[in-house]
Regions:
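Glycine-centered, small-residue-biased loops immediately flanking beta-strands
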Residues: 75, 100
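C-terminal hydrophobic helical "lid"/dimerization subdomain
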Residues: 73, 114-169
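Active-site PLP-lysine loop of aminotransferase-like
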Residues: 106-109
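Acidic carboxylate diad motif detector
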Residues: 80-81
Length: 169
């Protein structure tokens, strides 16, 4: 059940630089933990002693041990990318005894109806001001003309922070 303390928003974001910490705070993170300079597991559990509700993961093969350590009982580990490593090993007893849930999300296999509904909801949230975009909101936008598509791909491959957008109109 939702208790007053569970209703309070308390985002913890792991980052690799002070610049990314600034962007995460602009996007709404209340806490940032630099995983290159700090013991991320220790710092996250100091902020959320019972663990976090959800881990949003982009490198499951590397991070599964810490994900398991910092996710609360009945929590979720949501995976939407694979930045290295094709296999994840799950300690079965430790995982199922805490009723953890792994949720894999791949946009391309959701089905067009769900993609359309999500796009409609996101556009409505942006139009209403409920979802902010741009550097001041922690998500720098990098625009490229359609004829500069190769440069846009290169920006993504080089790890551009934020969103790389190709203008087609």
């Amino acid at each position: 059940p939702a208790t007053p303390s569970r209703l309070l928003r308390n985002e913890v974001t792991t980052i690799s630089s002070e610049e990314k910490a600034r962007l995460a705070r602009a996007a709404g993170a209340q806490h940032t933990v630099n995983y290159r300079e700090q013991d991320a597991e220790k710092e996250i559990l100091a902020i959320a002693p019972d663990g976090v509700d959800i881990v949003v993961e982009v490198a499951p093969a590397q991070n599964n041990p810490i994900d398991l350590a910092v996710t609360r009982v009945r929590g979720t580990i949501a995976i939407y990318a694979n930045n290295g490593g094709d296999e994840v090993t799950l300690p079965v007893r430790a995982t199922f005894s805490r009723n953890l849930r792994y949720q894999f999300v791949l946009l391309y296999t959701l089905g067009q109806d769900l993609v359309d509904a999500a796009a409609e909801d996101i556009n409505a949230a942006v139009a209403a001001g409920a979802l902010r975009v741009g550097e001041e909101a922690g998500v720098p936008l990098h625009h490229y003309a359609l004829e500069d598509l190769a440069a846009a791909h290169e920006a993504v491959e080089n790890g551009a922070v934020g969103k790389v957008l190709v203008d087609v109109a």
